[in-house]
A protein has these predicted regions:
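A structural signal for short, well-ordered beta-strand segments and their strand-loop junctions
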Residues: 28, 82, 113-116, 128, ...
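Active-site catalytic loop in hydrolytic enzyme cores
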Residues: 1-21, 120-197, 216-217, 278-293, ...
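C-terminal, beta-strand-rich globular interaction domains
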Residues: 108-114, 135, 147
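N-terminal, active-site-proximal structural segment of metallo-dependent hydrolase catalytic domains
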Residues: 1-77, 86
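CN hydrolase (nitrilase-like) catalytic-core segments centered on the catalytic cysteine
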Residues: 78-79, 86, 93-113, 119-120, ...
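Short, well-ordered beta-to-alpha junction loops that form the rim of enzyme active sites
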Residues: 84-85, 181
């Protein structure tokens, strides 16, 4: 199929912190294990569809999101990424209000904040805000997810994609694109984004029971010299009735390109591993401020 490409050009000094310190700091957060999705199903033309009614505990999620934004500011994160499905327009407003205030102590909010996607009116939308709380892009999910073996049998996500791909261009970084969960698993679509649109930084917010599919993406991105960040959420467990101990890897960072070697990087791939006693980076019961930080060194070919 055909897609319309929308280009958004950021000011050349958007990532001035990163340029000064010679690396880009990316924070990915699974947010919470408390975001339970409530949905309903309907049958149209012989196909069963599901639609999201609401996220239960949305107030807890909102607190988490605001705490993560604060943590990202303290840690000097340039791009903050959150998972799929757990967002709302109210959260978008709360975050925008927070970003619009001047931070203290010479700190800065992330240059880009990728909010948890919002499922509303048959659209699954990721909104990206700049450090002042202004909207950069809205990327809609283009490929519906098939919910398998739910109580009602297989159900297809009831979305009406807009067939638009938003590219964020920035000097020194290249082209940034967002692929919402299933979008990244569609080989033709991924191939087009990597080889035709020549994206250099791919962000994949997710709400998924398995990470096995996402490993295929790594090979594609590596060949295309594209860095990729995938983040899932621990809330999958409560929604899908899973034992959350089975969610071992909750995200990954792929640092592609010819970069200085980093001792923490195995083949340029870093897995965000959950620890069974709680999340690795905070140790707070109820995992309110979990964030994995990855630094991308500006290198030759990077």
């Amino acid at each position: 199929g055909t897609y319309e490409v929308w280009n958004r050009f950021l000011a050349p000094n958007t990532f001035w912190h990163a340029e000064k310190r010679k690396f880009l700091r990316i924070g990915v957060s699974p947010l919470s294990n408390q975001g339970k999705l409530e949905w309903h199903t309907e049958i149209k033309n012989g196909t069963q569809y599901f639609s999201i009614n609401k996220v239960e505990n949305i107030d807890i999620i909102e607190e988490n999101v605001l705490a993560i934004v604060d943590e990202a500011k303290k840690q000097g994160v340039d791009i903050l990424v959150m998972p799929e499905m757990l967002g709302s327009y109210h959260i978008r407003k709360s975050v925008a209000d927070k970003l619009s205030e001047f931070p203290e102590n010479d700190e800065s909010y992330p240059a880009l904040t990728v909010l948890p996607s919002i499922w509303e009116a048959h659209q699954n939308t990721v909104i990206v805000l700049d450090e002042y709380g202004d909207e950069v892009i809205r990327q809609e999910k283009q490929h519906p997810f098939m919910l398998k073996n739910s109580e009602e049998g297989n159900c297809l996500e009831n979305i009406n994609p807009d067939r638009k791909i938003h590219l964020i261009h920035c000097e020194g970084i290249g082209r940034i694109a967002i692929m919402v969960c299933k979008d990244a698993l569609m080989k033709d679509y991924l191939h087009m984004v990597l080889t035709v649109l020549k994206v250099t930084l791919l962000i994949i917010p997710s709400f998924s029971t398995g990470n096995y599919n996402f490993k295929e993406i790594i090979q594609y991105c590596r060949v295309a010299d594209c860095c990729a960040f995938w983040i899932n959420t621990c809330s999958v467990a409560i929604t899908m009735g899973l034992d959350d101990k089975k969610l071992k890897n909750i995200g990954f960072a792929l640092k592609a390109g010819k970069r200085p070697n980093d001792p923490n990087m195995e083949n340029g791939l870093f897995l965000c591993e959950r620890k069974s006693q709680g999340c690795e980076n905070c140790g707070i019961a109820g995992c309110n401020q979990c964030m994995f930080i990855h630094d991308l060194v500006f290198g030759k070919g990077g």
